[in-house]
Amino acid sequence: MSRRHKAERREVIPDAKFGNIIVSRFMNSIMRDGKKSVAESIVYGALDVVEAKAKSNPLDLFVTALENVAPAVEVRSRRVGGATYQVPVEVRTERRQTLAIRWLIASARARNEKTMVERLSAELLDAANNRGNAVKKREDTHRMAEANRAFSHYRW
């Protein structure tokens, strides 16, 4: 691995409907095989369903759902003298957002509703109300960090 240059982060263009960078990143994560228009229709469709069901601003609800799923701490493996410890570390803002997006999408894909629009909208509503698999994933991560608090002095 070359240490000469830092990897340059690509600029994400805000989405067309809301003009929001987070929605755009979410869309890019949903996208498979470069099919952006399909991802767009899924995300916008899900946000329309959310708006109809919750009768509130879908963007606010989306941001709330992301905040409820984003982890504050996680565990990272650290090898010390032949033993591997799970060391709890704080999560950087960028990674918090990335993990929240990843977990929301994974939880939505694992649901049983018929279409992805239905699955995603249901998961977003659940996450906004602190329920669902994505929130459970965050709770598990926090529980893991809490259980390994004794090793927090190994932080780097």
UniProtKB/Swiss-Prot annotation:
Annotated GO CC locations: small ribosomal subunit
Keyword Mitochondrion belongs to the record: no
Gene Ontology terms for molecular function: rRNA binding; structural constituent of ribosome; tRNA binding
Family: Belongs to the universal ribosomal protein uS7 family.
Task performed by this protein: One of the primary rRNA binding proteins, it binds directly to 16S rRNA where it nucleates assembly of the head domain of the 30S subunit. Is located at the subunit interface close to the decoding center, probably blocks exit of the E-site tRNA.
UniProt xrefs under PANTHER family: RIBOSOMAL PROTEIN S7 (PTHR11205)
Subunit structure: Part of the 30S ribosomal subunit. Contacts proteins S9 and S11.
Listed name of the protein: Small ribosomal subunit protein uS7
Biological source species: Azorhizobium caulinodans (strain ATCC 43989 / DSM 5975 / JCM 20966 / LMG 6465 / NBRC 14845 / NCIMB 13405 / ORS 571)
Upper lineage: Bacteria, Pseudomonadati, Pseudomonadota, Alphaproteobacteria, Hyphomicrobiales
